Amino acid sequence: DAFYACREQDYPKDHHEDWDYLVEKFDFQANQDSDFVLKNSRPAISAEEFKGQGVDAKWIVYGDFLGDQKCSILRLIVEPGGKTKFCPESPALFHTNGGSGRVGKLDVRYHHDMILGEIYPEIGFITQAALSKGGVEIENTGTEPLVLTFDFPQHAHSKTPGI
């Protein structure tokens, strides 16, 4: 059900399955802006709070647009043998874009030749429960850099990175 993937404050439970409510809330004009990236993207900026020995991090932020903090991405690169404790402000979805390693208890590995219908260990979540316990350890167990991309939801940061 699509409504369960939405934030409660955006789509209260009493409006689940209410497609008219969804259509009223949706900003069609903003979603059809063919120049969105040109108007809102910024160069990647260093994420000093997540850098360390053998660990590089960069924010990819589209800033505040339409008067609101909408999205941000953190690219984390852990060199072979490196590890770091990761505890961002907000839960996040992550994708493995290169290498292999461990995120918390989850073994992750990037796959070059994916087959539709197969399950691959390259996508996961950093949950609020994990953050409440101090975050997760990320370790590169492979021979090439472990590249992870964390997607943060809107309003994930107390201050939009780089703004």
What name fits each language-model region?
Residues 51-53, 100, 123, 133:
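Feature targets compositionally biased, intrinsically disordered low-complexity regions
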Residues 54-56, 65, 103, 126, ...:
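Compositionally biased, intrinsically disordered low-complexity regions
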Residues 74-75, 92, 97-100, 106, ...:
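C-terminal structured domain segments across diverse proteins
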Residues 2-91:
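C-terminal amphipathic alpha-helical segment
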Residues 73-75, 92-95, 124-126, 147-149:
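Ordered hydrophobic segments in well-structured contexts
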Residues 106-109, 117-158:
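Ligand-binding loop in jelly-roll beta-barrel domains
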Residues 71, 79-121:
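Glycine- and acidic-residue-biased ligand/ion/polar-headgroup-sensing regions
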